[in-house]
Amino acid sequence: MPILLDPVRAPALDALLASANTQGLDWRIEAAADATLPRIRGIGTLASAGPEEISFLTNPRYQSQLAGTRAAAVIVTPDAAQALANDPSAPACARVVCPHPYLLYARLAQWFDAARRPRLPASVHPLAVVAPDAVIEDDVRIGPHCVVEAGASIGRGSTLGPGCVIGEGSSLGPDCLLHARVTLYANVRIGARAILHSGVVLGADGFGFAPDPTLGQGAWGKIAQLGGVRIGDDVEIGANTTIDRGALEDTDIGDGVKLDNQIMLGHNVRVGAHTAMAACVGVAGSTVIGSRCTIGGAAMLSGHLTLGDDVHISGGTAVTSNILQPGRYTGVYPYAEHGEWQRNAAVLQQLSQLRRRLRALEKA
């Protein structure tokens, strides 16, 4: 990561840790008694960090990079700190000892991100269109070409990037950040501190159609989607992810849910608190996903299913039935050289026949 702060604004290590959000984390600084604590201008990896940056060690695979790091300070676990204290070849940099170094790194990254992007004053750009009855609370920033429709409300401290659309009756809680070109259809409700990346679309019609022979053989009649979308607090939604409105009830995304880019959630889907999904996941309508689940990239979930709490789906898995017990589930056919894959696929197609033959032999 490049150095983020100019030297004048760079805090000393202890001041940085005191001003960052370290709530719930125990940490201490270990440095030579006669050492002056360094000023920290940014964060870097062990390999790339310079003498004005802080780094971190969380994965034992990078232990070998520690001896050669040029970082001014390194975040390590108590066990790693003890090992370094007994290692004469250990780097002379300051050590920040914390049982959760990756989480502390995340908190410091948040601090630097906020420091390099100072909060802009509240304003409504002259090229924005805001309905007369829309409610805009204090300290809100609305960028150019935004549209805020009738009855919509924007919570205190929220920011709308250029080109965002907030549909009729939709609402944002406090301290939300919508990047450029986010679209909320009508009746979308979002809680506090949400982050929505560019291209997110919430509240488009669910894929609901009824066979309608009055329109012709094989024709479909549209089912009006009368529900909305509800998003909880502290939710982050990645670029170009779409969540459809419910048919009758709301599509519901719980507190703390994290959605990667290009995910599609169908109508009436419900996702429990603190569940995370990687890119390109597809969830068909009316499926219920529990709390604290993880779903790997490109996994596909059929409609009208239930996944219990603490279910973990590997990337690329197709889920076609309920999973009620916690645990990790994988349904990915392993890749192979193409010719070998074709031979294995041919065997798979004959499994039921081979099973019958085996049973017959066992009975003989």
UniProtKB/Swiss-Prot annotation:
Please give the catalytic activity noted in the UniProt record: a UDP-3-O-[(3R)-3-hydroxyacyl]-alpha-D-glucosamine + a (3R)-hydroxyacyl-[ACP] = a UDP-2-N,3-O-bis[(3R)-3-hydroxyacyl]-alpha-D-glucosamine + holo-[ACP] + H(+)
Q: Which InterPro entries match?
A: Hexapep (IPR001451), LpxD (IPR007691), Trimer_LpxA-like_sf (IPR011004), UDP_GlcNAc_AcTrfase_non-rep (IPR020573)
The record's Gene Ontology biological-process terms are: lipid A biosynthetic process
Q: Could you say which EC number(s) this protein's record lists?
A: 2.3.1.191
One Gene Ontology term, aspect cellular component: membrane
Q: Which GO terms describe its molecular function?
A: N-acyltransferase activity
**CDD domains tied to this protein:** LbH_LpxD
Keywords (alphabetical) are: Acyltransferase, Lipid A biosynthesis, Lipid biosynthesis, Lipid metabolism, Repeat, Transferase
Q: Which domain of life is it from?
A: Bacteria
Under the subunit heading, UniProt states: Homotrimer.
Q: Which NCBIfam families match?
A: lipid_A_lpxD, PRK00892.1
Please give the PANTHER family that the UniProt record associates with this protein: UDP-3-O-ACYLGLUCOSAMINE N-ACYLTRANSFERASE, UDP-3-O-ACYLGLUCOSAMINE N-ACYLTRANSFERASE 1, MITOCHONDRIAL-RELATED
Q: Tell me the protein family, please.
A: Belongs to the transferase hexapeptide repeat family. LpxD subfamily.
Q: What does this protein do?
A: Catalyzes the N-acylation of UDP-3-O-acylglucosamine using 3-hydroxyacyl-ACP as the acyl donor. Is involved in the biosynthesis of lipid A, a phosphorylated glycolipid that anchors the lipopolysaccharide to the outer membrane of the cell.
The entry's protein name is UDP-3-O-acylglucosamine N-acyltransferase
Q: Which organism is it from?
A: Bordetella petrii (strain ATCC BAA-461 / DSM 12804 / CCUG 43448)
